[in-house]
Amino acid sequence: MLPIITYPHPLLKKRSEPVTLFDEELRQFLDEMYITMLAKNGVGLAAVQVGNPIRALIVNIPDEEGNQERENLLEIINPEFLSKEGEIQFNEGCLSVPEFYEDVTRFDRVRLTYQDRYGERHEIEAEGYLAVALQHEIDHLNGILFIDKLSLIKRKKFEKELKKRQRASL
């Protein structure tokens, strides 16, 4: 299992680099990301969250029973949005911002192009929860956290909670 870095780690604010080598090392890394995401009860994980600032992420939305089957796993490398439409409010959390959840406004429908673990190009259209998860993880690749999208009042609430937790852990 890979260690997850948490806010305010400076790597989380860095733009990730494109993947150019689609080799066995990358595939093994993606497998380790999947194991880590499941162990931490996540639905998505960007490579930068485990300390590797490359443009790679995984998303696995649970089914109705809460299962995250391997065949439903999306491995998204070098993503580029083609279109974004609509608006949705979604209560988000993040493995790199533990124990904090807040409503974030996102696009409701997205279309993007990406490469898979072998470098093959694909296109996907997503809406609702999947669209939100993809935007959240792609934001990580651009050095953006969901807390960066909060209103000033909600951001201050987060900073206050963070300071409180930091004092409690001393």
Curated annotation (Swiss-Prot):
Xref: InterPro entries: Peptide_deformylase (IPR023635), Peptide_deformylase_sf (IPR036821)
Keyword Iron in record: yes
Matches recorded under Pfam families: Pep_deformylase
Origin species: Wolinella succinogenes (strain ATCC 29543 / DSM 1740 / CCUG 13145 / JCM 31913 / LMG 7466 / NCTC 11488 / FDC 602W)
Cofactor binding, note field: Binds 1 Fe(2+) ion.
Family to which the UniProt record says this protein belongs: Belongs to the polypeptide deformylase family.
SUPFAM superfamilies: Peptide deformylase
Residues at the catalytic site: 137
Reaction(s) catalysed (UniProt annotation): N-terminal N-formyl-L-methionyl-[peptide] + H2O = N-terminal L-methionyl-[peptide] + formate
Protein name in UniProt: Peptide deformylase
